[in-house]
């Protein structure tokens, strides 16, 4: 087996900025930023969204208002739907 062909696997600190939650996960990602967390320095990655802030995982229900769009579509194309 060849040596030095696999990327370096290390603990990386991911920060969900929306929920202000930190995750310490093993990863091969390479970063230029580092941050001290629980007394040790880790590579640092910021996230816009994760399982801590995504509506699907948090249980927040966001319904898109399609009724207005459907009504405007039907109004616009109602004249083509005439039955003879």
Swiss-Prot record:
Keyword hit for Transcription: no
GO biological process: translation
InterPro entries: Ribosomal_bL28/bL31-like_sf (IPR034704), Ribosomal_bL31 (IPR002150), Ribosomal_bL31_B (IPR027493), Ribosomal_bL31_sf (IPR042105)
Single Gene Ontology MF annotation: structural constituent of ribosome
Annotated keywords: Ribonucleoprotein, Ribosomal protein
PROSITE patterns: RIBOSOMAL_L31
Cellular component per GO, a single term: ribosome
HAMAP family per the UniProt record, alphabetical: Ribosomal_bL31_2
Entries under PANTHER family matching the protein: 50S RIBOSOMAL PROTEIN L31, CHLOROPLASTIC, LARGE RIBOSOMAL SUBUNIT PROTEIN BL31C
Quaternary structure annotation from Swiss-Prot or TrEMBL: Part of the 50S ribosomal subunit.
NCBIfam families for this protein: L31 (TIGR00105), PRK01678.1 (NF002462)
Stated name of the protein: Large ribosomal subunit protein bL31B
Source organism per UniProt: Acinetobacter baumannii (strain ATCC 17978 / DSM 105126 / CIP 53.77 / LMG 1025 / NCDC KC755 / 5377)
Lineage: Bacteria, Pseudomonadati, Pseudomonadota, Gammaproteobacteria, Moraxellales
């Amino acid at each position: 087996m060849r040596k030095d062909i696999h990327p370096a696997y290390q603990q990386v600190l991911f920060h969900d900025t929306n929920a202000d939650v930190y995750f310490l996960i093993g990863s091969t990602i390479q970063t230029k930023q580092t941050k001290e967390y629980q007394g040790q320095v880790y590579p640092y990655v910021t996230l816009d969204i994760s399982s801590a802030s995504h509506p699907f995982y948090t249980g927040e229900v966001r319904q898109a208002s399609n009724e207005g769009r459907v009504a405007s579509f039907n109004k616009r194309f109602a004249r083509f739907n005439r039955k003879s």
